[in-house]
Amino acid sequence: MQILVVCRPVRDGDQTEFRRLVPAEGAALRELKESGVLSNAWTPGRPGAVLMLEVGTEDDAAAIAAALPLAAAGLITTEVIPLHPMDL
């Protein structure tokens, strides 16, 4: 199942802690990429990200997103969007 995850920084989040966790976030994303769970990732050119996950269920994606270091620290929100094929 393909899931889009939109990650946005929380308003008034601790920027020092955010910067401190960025390397751990990158490492976590690289691990997901190497395992085949993260198929692609994009940045809007500012803090935040859009991730494409390949997982079994929407709940799997939500758990993965919640476990990311910045999400676990309460410094980003994650919106999990299941994608479905379109008949064209």
Region annotations inferred by a language model:
Residues 1-88:
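Conserved, structured core segments of small domains
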